Amino acid sequence: MLQMPSKQPISAGIVIVAAGRGERAGSPTEGPKQYRPIGGKPVIVHTLENFMTWEPATAIVVVIHPDDEALFAKAFRHIISATPIETVHGGPTRQRSVLAGLRYLKDKHVSHVLIHDAVRPFFDHTLLDRIAENLANGALAVLPAMPVTDTLKRADGAGTVLTTVSREQLFAAQTPQSFAFETILDAHEKAAASGRSDFTDDASIAEWLGIPVTIVEGTGDNVKLTVKKDIAMADDKLSASLLPDVRTGNGYDVHQLEAGDGVTLCGVFIPHDQKLKGHSDADVALHALTDALLATCGAGDIGDHFPPSDPQWKGAASRIFIEHAARIVRERGGTIMNADVSLIAEAPKVGPHREAMRANLSEYLGIDLERCSVKATTNETIGFVGRREGIAAIATATVVYRGRT
């Protein structure tokens, strides 16, 4: 609990309004905007994390749409919080959703409440402390707001300008809008009982009942993510500020040699008096590199995706496996930066085919040739490799995952 320089401390309940559908934020198949990723995490997680680390917050309730329970549960996996976080279902309007959250907090023994839009993730503790100081000093309602700086025009229904509106004493309201708890709960209950459902924010309900609302300075970053472009800009902003998430994966594979007419390594067929034994084409190099790529995002290994017991992969080209792994990496936000393969074999000689192998890796992975390396060494006639009983491969992949913490 944060003791302000005032006569009373603040014990704050937090209501996060997250029941909206976000029709203006793109295709419905993309999901509600509060669950879209920015900087590697859902919008709502960024919002919650700001409140979770604010000392006066003693209870947090997130008001969600009934259809979004699975989405919230998935987002909640990102969260470790000492402050209790609960959910309730919202109503058909923002006003009804807020009331549901307030009713939930009735037995949580909070003195004040901050009501915040889930899709405003860019507030900070300085703003919260400014609000709390005013509440602690006796304000019944506190509204963060910014002076209007754009020129405002009033137009008729046809889009013709009627007049220029003075900006003096005009403010753009933000959230969290904050109140003495019993005051705003009573105001919301009275609004519901009166049949009024047209209030667009909580300060308006306080104004309707004559409750004085104190304005404190908001922040320019505390914007509401409304349309698809807002979400893209927010993602760029956060991703640019994060340290790069560089991951390295390793892979190892070995295949036996048997009598045959050649081996396939990195997709290149090399004539030889032996061949590699395996369920697919036994390209030991690509198998090792496939595992290395999958390792960078914890996606298992090649056997999980292409089990040797599955007859459809009998004799399959290993290009299928490596391109599958590269696709998984990209779907999870990764950019492949480097691929390195070391082959351990007594024969055949790899040197004459190295550039063709590198070219294949470049094509399969969709990266520049200079980012692909193929090396070879013998085992100095030691062990199964030295006895020409098999070929081994060690691979390393470096992947940068964008927008992860």
UniProtKB/Swiss-Prot annotation:
CDD domains: CDP-ME_synthetase, MECDP_synthase
Reported cofactor(s): a divalent metal cation
Keywords: Isoprene biosynthesis, Lyase, Metal-binding, Multifunctional enzyme, Nucleotidyltransferase, Transferase
Renumbered residue ranges of the record's region 2-C-methyl-D-erythritol 2,4-cyclodiphosphate synthase: 247-405
Pfam families from the UniProt entry: IspD, YgbB
Catalytic activity: 2-C-methyl-D-erythritol 4-phosphate + CTP + H(+) = 4-CDP-2-C-methyl-D-erythritol + diphosphate; 4-CDP-2-C-methyl-D-erythritol 2-phosphate = 2-C-methyl-D-erythritol 2,4-cyclic diphosphate + CMP
Amino acids binding 4-CDP-2-C-methyl-D-erythritol 2-phosphate: D253, V254, H255, H279, S280, D301, I302, G303, T377, T378, N379, E380, F384, R387
SUPFAM superfamilies: IpsF-like, Nucleotide-diphospho-sugar transferases
Site (Positions MEP for the nucleophilic attack) residue list: R167, K224
Family that this chain belongs to: In the N-terminal section; belongs to the IspD/TarI cytidylyltransferase family. IspD subfamily. In the C-terminal section; belongs to the IspF family.
PANTHER family noted in UniProt: 2-C-METHYL-D-ERYTHRITOL 2,4-CYCLODIPHOSPHATE SYNTHASE, CHLOROPLASTIC
The protein's role, per its UniProt record: Bifunctional enzyme that catalyzes the formation of 4-diphosphocytidyl-2-C-methyl-D-erythritol from CTP and 2-C-methyl-D-erythritol 4-phosphate (MEP) (IspD), and catalyzes the conversion of 4-diphosphocytidyl-2-C-methyl-D-erythritol 2-phosphate (CDP-ME2P) to 2-C-methyl-D-erythritol 2,4-cyclodiphosphate (ME-CPP) with a corresponding release of cytidine 5-monophosphate (CMP) (IspF).
Protein name: Bifunctional enzyme IspD/IspF
Organism of origin: Rhizobium etli (strain CIAT 652)
Gene: ispDF
